[in-house]
Amino acid sequence: HHPGHGVDGLIIPDLPYEEQGELKAALENVSGAPILIQLVSPVSKERIPMLTKDAKGFIYCVSQMGVTGKGANFHKKIREYLLEVKKNSPVPVMMGFGIRTAKDVESLCDIIDGAIVGSHFIKLMKENNYDTKAVKDYIQTFKKEMNV
């Protein structure tokens, strides 16, 4: 958490693992700097241990390839991929990209520790004149549907 800024972690979608070293080192050398959240895409099983070993905070599992916000069109081997990440992860495993409803993730709740809803929140805010009540109501409904 960076004092006064409220930033606990950074998610940088297109930063390859092999190019993270310099940024990670810089963040680790600054007191109170945010952590770098590791993104893991549906990749070959062999890369998953490397991608997860130094994770901090949580792992952001990308549920599908392409652009976020287009709906739940998850990778065809989503369960196998998530199980492999979970098996190797030292931190909670969250899944995001294309999640709009509890139904989108209910069949994966036995594997993931949480769901990340991003683009849909932005859409709700825009549709409701940036009134946070719409997002709060959405979260309550989502939680109720997930029995959380």
Where are the language model's segments positioned?
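Expand to "…catalyze enediolate/carbanion chemistry for C-C bond making/breaking, isomerization
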Residues: 63, 87, 100-108, 138-148
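Conserved, mostly hydrophobic/aromatic
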Residues: 2, 51, 108, 118, ...
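Catalytic cores of alpha/beta
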Residues: 43-53, 95, 99-115
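Hydrophobic faces of well-ordered beta-strands that scaffold small-molecule active sites
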Residues: 10-12, 36-39, 59-61, 93-97, ...
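Surface-exposed amphipathic alpha-helices with a cationic face
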Residues: 3, 24-31, 79-88, 139-147
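Structural motif
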Residues: 5, 54, 88, 110-111
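Active-site-adjacent beta->alpha loops and helix N-cap segments on the catalytic face
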Residues: 11-31, 44-50, 68-83, 102-105, ...
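C-terminal helical cap(s) of enzyme catalytic domains, especially alpha/beta-barrels
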Residues: 122-148
